[in-house]
Amino acid sequence: MKQQKCNYFPSLWWRGREKGLSTFLFLLLFSISLHAQRQDILLNNNWNFRFSHQVQGDTRRVDLPHTWNAQDALAGKIDYKRGIGNYEKALYIRPEWKGKRLFLRFDGVNSIADVFINRKHIGEHRGGYGAFIFEITDLVKYGEKNSVLVRANNGEQLDIMPLVGDFNFYGGIYRDVHLLITDETCISPLDYASPGVYLVQEVVSPQEAKVCAKVNLSNRAADGTAELQVLVTDGTKVICKESRNVSLKQGADILEQLPLLIQKPRLWNGCEDPFMYQVSISLHKDGKQIDSVTQPLGLRYYHTDPDKGFFLNGKHLPLHGVCRHQDRAEVGNALRPQHHEEDVALMREMGVNAIRLAHYPQATYMYDLMDKHGIVTWAEIPFVGPGGYADKGFVDQASFRENGKQQLIELIRQHYNHPSICFWGLFNELKEVGDNPVEYVKELNALAKQEDPTRPTTSASNQDGNLNFITENIAWNRYDGWYGSTPKTLATFLDRTHKKHPELRIGISEYGAGASIYHQQDSLKQPSASGWWHPENWQTYYHMENWKIIAERPFVWGTFVWNMFDFGAAHRTEGDRPGINDKGLVTFDRKVRKDAFYFYKANWNKQEPMIYLAEKRCRLRYQPEQTFMAFTTAPEAELFVNGVSCGKQKADTYSTVVWKNVKLTSGENIIRVTTPGKKPLTDEVTVEYKEDRPL
């Protein structure tokens, strides 16, 4: 593929044209809207669905996104349906589209998709979490209805990541489907379903930013020339513009590179200021725009220090992170935009500034929201090991290895321009037994650096071994105080590892404990993780103790609670019901924030004054003397029992206020906490003290 290198000199067009920027921007955007030829049509409605074992007449109408496992998998059926589902739709192709180029883009089908146009097989995609695209320009009948058939298969495969996982493998077309219509000469969408544009941040500082815009062009028209323009705006004015005339041979695909030089840039600065420029890349012929693509540009620079942690734009930034699976009650993984928005709103309420989107690429809209809200993101491929289970996460065969590389390239190219993404994750909980994955992970690491030298790689480990010394960053999944041991074990592990390997950039990729909001106890006892009893107060204690250990160790570059939300795992038989991993800080339906949520909110979100009385769901008390606890952003709080003050207590370093040996009277007791000041905050609950505990 022919390439043109970047040279960082201000273009002649730009010199002396600082005046009249607003007028120019208005006219330019008007021109774009007037002449832009690309169309993006959603094809989500009116699909006919049937399983392969059903006859043609058994179809039912569905709209996308859709999964056929929203009921059985979420009911905890370990044998939930894993097989082939057929989706068919009549698509009318307008006669005026003749002479254009047509593409079918799928944002996500799990995990194999075979696509047919008018019953002719046009292609297959293997992998359930990345987007893919097929050109159908010469495969459709213009002025007629065409059949689009997709055979989705979520059956077990030995050559597609992931092989295993502590989550559900929902089947279906669970993300959007698009029909893209472009000019014969276009910015190519065919490069692994990427935008066709890569904004490479080669040098970024408070003084200047040098960005190389790499643009894939595709031409089916006759030989000719076109003008390629790249325009950077800040929302109100043009910051810089570059253009170049390019020669295009018929049938050619070329890569053009244009330099962008921005003086004194406004940086993308996490949650504090998630500012992004907008970059419009457009193609012009004969003075008319024939195609355009717009991408975000969030300029930032960052690094991780083995002793001091993560730095964004030269300033230390403790990463207060969570992990997130992409499913929820009743809909499985077939999420709509409002579901992603609600998840992010809950994270921001809690004070989250980092996220690990586990264990696979998630919806583009989710990455868009991470950009918008300034949440530092760890994005990863679904290279998932067995964890505590008996299956294999790696099979050393060529087809599996190639599939993993394909999914890594898809992840990086499709999401390259998201400023929130700061880490590419390569694996989770692999084991060095049998087929040893070490050499393959080295290949993945080299591929990631080849695709994107600007971002560090990372991984999530749960054991010792050579796997921990491949990626630039390393993090561990730790459950000290849940799967046995105590929270103190985490401190021992971190200190020992940092001392033994001071060169390692150490993070915590998972830590958490299960909790049911229906399981309450007025004494603190560690439960069995595999049992049916998952008391909420143990989860709260677990997070309080683990967070104290983490916060006292600045060398830990980032920590990610497992998990922000309860999620589906059909094989689990524990907690208050089967089929749910209940380690979330919020329930599966997003309706209830657990107590540990408020502990983190008090510690991470100092912008929102709050007080929260813990263990309010524990309404029955059997101990005559109780300990009450509140989480607050205030320096102190006062406790009242039945209107009588039990005294004021100072909040500790971790925003927690505790009153011990509080006596209750038989029957109902009104417990209230309040903060001092002219605008006091209060929280209260009524509990019942019973002298006789049921057997």
Swiss-Prot record:
Keyword Hydrolase belongs to the record: yes
Domain of life: Bacteria
Similarity comment: family membership: Belongs to the glycosyl hydrolase 2 family.
Binding site for D-glucuronate: 428, 477, 483, 562, 583
Gene3D superfamilies found in the cross-reference section: Galactose-binding domain-like, Glycosidases, Immunoglobulins
Reaction(s) this enzyme catalyzes, per UniProt: a beta-D-glucuronoside + H2O = D-glucuronate + an alcohol
SUPFAM superfamilies: (Trans)glycosidases, beta-Galactosidase/glucuronidase domain, Galactose-binding domain-like
Positions annotated as active site in the UniProt record: 429 (proton donor)
Domain comment quoted from the record: The N-K motif seems to be a discriminant that could be employed as a fingerprint to identify beta-glucuronidases from the large GH2 family of proteins.
InterPro entries in the record: Beta-gal/glucu_dom_sf, DUF4982, Galactose-bd-like_sf, GH2_Domain-Containing, Glyco_hydro_2, Glyco_hydro_2_cat, Glyco_hydro_2_Ig-like, Glyco_hydro_2_N
Sample GO molecular function, one term: beta-galactosidase activity
The enzyme's E.C. designation: 3.2.1.31
GO biological process entries: carbohydrate metabolic process
Function: Displays beta-glucuronidase activity with the artificial substrate p-nitrophenyl-beta-D-glucuronide (PNPG). Is likely capable of scavenging glucuronate from a range of chemically distinct xenobiotic and endobiotic glucuronides present in the gastrointestinal (GI) tract, to be able to utilize these diverse sources of carbon. As part of the GI microbiome, this enzyme would be able to reactivate glucuronide drug conjugates, such reactivated compounds can significantly damage the GI tract.
Residue ranges annotated as motif N-K motif: 581-583
Entry-linked Pfam families: DUF4982, Glyco_hydro_2, Glyco_hydro_2_C, Glyco_hydro_2_N
Name listed for the protein in its UniProt record: Beta-glucuronidase
Keyword set includes Hydrolase: yes
Keywords, ordered alphabetically: Glycosidase, Hydrolase
Organism name: Bacteroides fragilis (strain ATCC 25285 / DSM 2151 / CCUG 4856 / JCM 11019 / LMG 10263 / NCTC 9343 / Onslow / VPI 2553 / EN-2)
